[in-house]
Amino acid sequence: MSTASKSPAPSRRVTKLLIRDLAQAVSPAGTHAPIRGREAMRSVDVVEDAFILCEGGRISAIGRMRALDPLDGDVEELDGSGCAAIPGLVDCHTHAVFAGSRAEEFELRSGGATYEELHAAGGGILSTVRATRAAGAEGLADALALHRSWMLASGTTTFEAKSGYGLDRDTELAMLRVVREAGGSPTWLGAHAVPPEFADADAYVDFALAEVLPEAAKIAEAADVFLERGAFDAAQARRYLEACRGAGLRLRLHADQFTEAGGVPLAIELDAVSVDHLEATGPDGVRALAQSDVAAVLLPVAALFLDRPMPPGRALMDEGAIVALATDFNPGSAFCESLPLVVALSCTQMHMSPAEALAACTVNAAHVLGRADRVGRLAPGYEADIVLLDASDWRYLAYHLGANHVAQVIRAGTPTA
């Protein structure tokens, strides 16, 4: 692939871009979202010897090179020889705004300490809260810019990021603003942990709803809660989520990461957009999700990082649930920004096919974020967010474990540096 001489500077917006001579242009089949069911999830559209034409930041045409008509006007060209093009990847669950490091805790866990033990001792999430509060808005913006560059380099063009490492009014709102200003989808994770200045979870929920929610609802697109032993119970989660729904926020839950604590039925009852993690979800929860419109967002890196069982991805797929994939990128339990690694783990550890995994981190992840009408597919009218892989077969995204085959990322029709 020859890109060095034809890629414009990242600050220059391209009006019309032709990506030509692609080995493949690949996208989940169909036009609807979300995608569910084995047959639909395994259907991909593959155009060989392909071109993609982008105009005004959107895809205007895709086809075989032999069908390409002469183009009028000033057109930037990008040589895609030997490359497969896929939709820009969508990471619908991250904690990408944080300060500090938890490398020391990683070493302690490697020696046998558990995530829950570290959290109970004042480490874990609370150690990141201390560092994040001290960073200030400018420090948080710088941290997100760095983390965002890592994500972009691995093919993520659309991302969500949560608050939840401030747990006070000013830091929580600063985190949400930083995400919005970076072009991400901000989620208020006000109920992530109980900060040390509060005696109990109920008192903290009172504070969060009274003092933070009114302003958070003006910035965030969704609200999230960590429903788990040692964090917030089902009654506290319900109170928090019902108030957030009343403020106009879409609802999401962290649930069943370590124990089944009522998160799945609560998500279904409250018509949440997603319930995330699900490492501990049993057959009843799988069936209930399959009969609902709540998406199951699976985070295999977190399971690997914490040496936990993988989520029941294959069972959820076979039952017909809406399944999305994400990194859970965070400093403590999933220090990984790579959706290609998530795809590989989903195939090798959760027995998903490459096509299912691709749909789960494009169309279905975009559905979770309310963006499936404009990102997640290579199709005319969609935003021109495109990833070129330096492989002629798109399945190398999953097949070459640990490698980064992302050769070029196009965002809104403009190649990035």
Region spans (language model):
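N-terminal metal-binding scaffold of metallo-dependent hydrolase/deaminase domains
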Residues: M1-P70
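Metal-coordinating catalytic core of metallo-dependent amide/deamination hydrolases
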Residues: G123-A145, S149, T157-A261
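Short peripheral tails and domain-boundary helices/loops at the edges of structured domains
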Residues: V406-A417
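Active-site-adjacent C-terminal substructures of enzyme catalytic domains
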Residues: R250, T259-R377, L389-W394, L401-A403, ...
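Metal-associated gating/positioning segment near the N- to mid-region
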Residues: G80-A143
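Divalent metal-coordination and catalytic microenvironments
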Residues: L22, I52, G57, G82, ...
